[in-house]
């Protein structure tokens, strides 16, 4: 299957290099490039399998792009790709939800990192769906338990009324019998 990849990159040569490394790594990809915040915002209305982002963009940064993507509720795998990225920025990117970061000088890691990020995202989504299904099942179980408890209480009340009526009726008959005996005894 062909992956849909959004690439935030302002340099044509770097974009071509990323596309070449994806293909060299065996990834069939339809790669769409944007280089500014407005185009990114428009592109985020589509569904993507992977987002790759340069760190330094004109008037914009890869971290700002990541924040925008996450604030829109998009949980697409995100890899920061940059010519120069310090450890602090890499750590901040990972804390903000990036799946990985790569230096442009080490693009041989791009295809494996992309596949790993996509698989991790699929696993995360499957876990979320399973957690949601489990939560739904637990809620149904709670509702059934409450219904069962209410049914038990209703049945107990009905049995108690029936016993009360039977015993009450029996006692009334005994009272009548005793009254009759007392009236007719010497």
Annotate each language-model stretch with its function.
Residues 29-31:
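Short beta-strand elements in bilobed, periplasmic/extracellular small-molecule ligand-binding domains
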Residues 10-11, 15, 55, 101, ...:
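Generic detector of well-ordered alpha-helical packing
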Residues 128-186:
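Coiled-coil dimerization/phosphotransfer module
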Residues 37, 57, 185:
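Hydrophobic pocket-lining residues within nucleotide cofactor-binding pockets
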Residues 33-42, 62:
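Helix N-cap/capping motif at the beta->alpha junctions
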